[in-house]
């Protein structure tokens, strides 16, 4: 891979056409291979390898429960979960591959643009799990079979119900500019979080930078991770969050905490977290088995129930009490544009918010 120290834009210079819109419509290789079912031969080969390494930006408790479910289903294969933020996952793999270290088998990132880089660099392995071929929408799978949407979620507005009455809560991003919210808003940073970078791109595209200029005058609390605004909200340090993980709000609310999600009338930013296998996988059969498991109905139901995430697998059931995904207006994801404009967005945001 390229030097992981150079900019996101530099790493993808000239490759913006690799991804069109929200769809994973990369066209730089052959067509996707035929879908592969889980067979006794694959299971036997995977058990001979005995392990699989999963690099992920998924919340650690969710990743660990996924790993335990796989180990329970396929005894004798240990899953090593390496969990960190999406940017650090990307950097680590870049550093390892630059040193000819092939330690990762399967990867997940909350920054879909990472998969553009890995695919362009020719280090992802084409592999299509049977469930992906049968059930996943076209726009949620790479046409060359190198990755697919393992999880989706939203970056949303939310509020602390102990500090804000429901009829006074913001209903839109425009509402956050009301002077009554000055000093009461928390927001994450696109320079740190892949989720917030994606959300910031969609918001500046749909709302314009003028909205951010007005928000910057609201004396917001600036935090780093997309998981931080829900935490500040829960603690009562701020009354409203302008962005952050929907799934954290679900988890907190269902645990009895005083938080409530809001789906902005302008649309909520859509975040996509794909999974892929590396060509240099040291455990290729275990990698295929784990990848197939991740996209199965059972695993997808697990990330919904345990992780508060969304799934495009049509056989899953949404958890009662959560607003159905089909009823939510969302903004359009565009990973290629995020990669192309990411550095400029970070620079402009940092200058605007002075942090």
Regions found by a protein language model. Name each.
Residues 1-24:
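N-terminal secretory signal peptides
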């Amino acid at each position: 891979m390229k030097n992981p120290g150079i900019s996101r834009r530099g790493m993808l210079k000239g490759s913006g056409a690799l991804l069109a819109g929200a769809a994973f419509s990369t066209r730089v290789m052959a067509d996707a291979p035929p879908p592969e079912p889980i067979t006794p031969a694959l299971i036997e080969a995977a058990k001979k390898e005995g392990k699989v390494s999963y690099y992920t930006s998924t919340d650690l408790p969710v990743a660990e429960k996924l790993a335990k479910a796989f180990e329970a289903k396929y005894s004798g294969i240990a899953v090593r979960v390496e969990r960190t933020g999406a940017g650090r996952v990307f950097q680590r793999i870049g550093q390892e591959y630059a040193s000819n270290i092939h330690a990762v088998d399967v990867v997940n990132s909350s920054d879909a643009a990472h998969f553009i880089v890995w695919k362009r660099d020719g280090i992802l392995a084409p592999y299509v799990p049977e469930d992906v071929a049968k059930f996943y929408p076209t726009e949620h799978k790479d046409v060359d079979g190198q990755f697919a949407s393992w999880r989706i979620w939203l970056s949303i507005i939310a509020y602390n119900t102990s500090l804000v009455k429901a009829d006074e809560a913001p209903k839109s991003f425009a509402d956050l500019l009301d002077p009554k919210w000055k000093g009461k808003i928390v927001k994450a940073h696109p320079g740190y979080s892949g989720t917030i970078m994606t959300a910031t791109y969609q918001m500046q595209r749909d709302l314009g930078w003028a909205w951010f200029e007005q928000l910057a005058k609201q004396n917001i609390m600036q935090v780093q991770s997309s998981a931080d605004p829900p935490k500040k909200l829960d603690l009562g340090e701020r009354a409203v969050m302008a962005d952050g993980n929907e799934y954290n709000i679900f988890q907190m609310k269902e645990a009895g905490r005083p938080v409530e999600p809001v789906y902005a009338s302008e649309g909520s930013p859509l975040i996509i977290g794909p999974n892929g296998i590396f060509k240099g996988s040291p455990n290729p059969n275990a990698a295929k088995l784990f990848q197939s498991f991740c996209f199965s109905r059972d695993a997808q139901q697990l990330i919904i129930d345990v992780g508060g995430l969304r799934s495009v697998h049509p056989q899953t059931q949404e958890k009662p009490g959560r607003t159905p995904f089909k009823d939510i207006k969302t903004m359009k994801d565009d990973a290629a544009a995020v990669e192309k404009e990411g550095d400029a967005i970070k620079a402009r945001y940092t200058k605007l918010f002075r942090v």
